[in-house]
Amino acid sequence: MAQLETRTEPMVVNFGPHHPSMHGVLRLVVTLDGENVIDCEPVIGYLHRGMEKIAENRTNVMYVPYVSRMDYAAGMFYEAIVVNAPERLANISVPKRASYIRVLMLELNRIANHLLWLGPFLADVGAQTPFFYIFREREMIYDLWEAATGQRLINNNFFRIGGVACDLPYGWLEKCIDFCDWFAPKIDEYEKLITNNPIFKKRIEGLGTIERDQAINWSLSGPMLRASGVSWDLRKVDNYECYDDFDWKIASEKEGDCYARYRVRVEEMRQSLKIIRQACEMIPGGPTENLEAKRMATDDKKSDIFGIDYQYVAKKVAPTFKIPNGELYTRLESGKGEIGVFIQGNNEVTPWRFKIRAADLNNLQILPHILKGAKIADIMAILGSIDVIMGSVDR
């Protein structure tokens, strides 16, 4: 008796675009053979707002409030890179105290970014409970931002050419250390719940594997690169701001799968806590209360401490600051990877060219490659492990 052969026709399915609060307005045109993915075409651009052209028609002071809306989970990083580019082009130095304040804000943002990634990622693979624990700690970071900048999630508008908008408020460093003391055991709690959970490990181990050479050839960065065995972090490589003052290590894994990317991000939160603690202890001038006491002791309203006016921790750059002739590319390590800005000035208040390199756009490009051969149920787990924010991808 002849054996019947079952043949299936490929089926094209549209995933998304989803609501921005989920995985963003990303559309995946997926070709399926049964439950197996045989092709995937990402469709982007739904959230394109012309951020580069806006930058070319605004002064730097006017443009800084815009940029946190690109990656609305990590706005501080874009504020930093947008002011770093003209600073380097014009050779503007940053006071040491301002540099320490920047590092504090960036590392808090790195933790907030990873927490915002971790909660939805766990929900994607079926673990709902940790989602609520993670958002509890994230709110504490936003409380610190609100005290320092007046805003919580986006539109902090805190970074300035030459420094930051203002000094830290009274008691802020103490509250920041309190947060570190609170959050460190919470990471251990997450790991007890998640890391060695047999259901979680079986769900994502070996899923979406990226080899070391593939990660390099696809220009991946951040946890996507370090999870594939490449120990590359711009905080160590470029030593921007004052990261060379601190003792910390690069988090990396070798397996290159979704589980390795999870392990890298959890370890990065631990390392960020180490940096924050050291910055709080080593910040020039100490807490703001100490600076005020020194000013009152000297009876000098414009006390020059560490070469800066303590009331405004920045070199005061005029709103009509002209970007000098020249061009350069500057970069930094965000929670998602390398973000950079290519700026070209022509001695005008607005740049002639302003090109933004988003980490998640480069990381997203490998998605069709690692989805081929996967099951339809694994699509959201693999996409979630990449950590994309479509405002940053589309710009």
Curated annotation (Swiss-Prot):
Domain of life: Bacteria
Keywords: Membrane, NAD, NADP, Plastoquinone, Quinone, Thylakoid, Translocase, Transport
Enzyme Commission numbers on file: 7.1.1.-
Localization in the cell: Cellular thylakoid membrane
GO annotation (BP), single: photosynthesis, light reaction
Enzyme class: translocase
Known catalytic reactions: a plastoquinone + NADH + (n+1) H(+)(in) = a plastoquinol + NAD(+) + n H(+)(out); a plastoquinone + NADPH + (n+1) H(+)(in) = a plastoquinol + NADP(+) + n H(+)(out)
Entry GO terms, CC: plasma membrane-derived thylakoid membrane
GO molecular function: NAD binding; oxidoreductase activity, acting on NAD(P)H, quinone or similar compound as acceptor; quinone binding
Residues passing through the membrane, by range: none
Membrane topology: Peripheral membrane protein
Any Pfam family the entry gives: Complex1_49kDa
HAMAP family: NDH1_NuoD (MF_01358)
Family: Belongs to the complex I 49 kDa subunit family.
Function as written in the Swiss-Prot or TrEMBL entry: NDH-1 shuttles electrons from an unknown electron donor, via FMN and iron-sulfur (Fe-S) centers, to quinones in the respiratory and/or the photosynthetic chain. The immediate electron acceptor for the enzyme in this species is believed to be plastoquinone. Couples the redox reaction to proton translocation, and thus conserves the redox energy in a proton gradient. Cyanobacterial NDH-1 also plays a role in inorganic carbon-concentration.
Name this protein carries in UniProt: NAD(P)H-quinone oxidoreductase subunit H
Highest classification ranks of the organism: Bacteria, Bacillati, Cyanobacteriota, Cyanophyceae, Synechococcales
Gene this chain is encoded by: ndhH
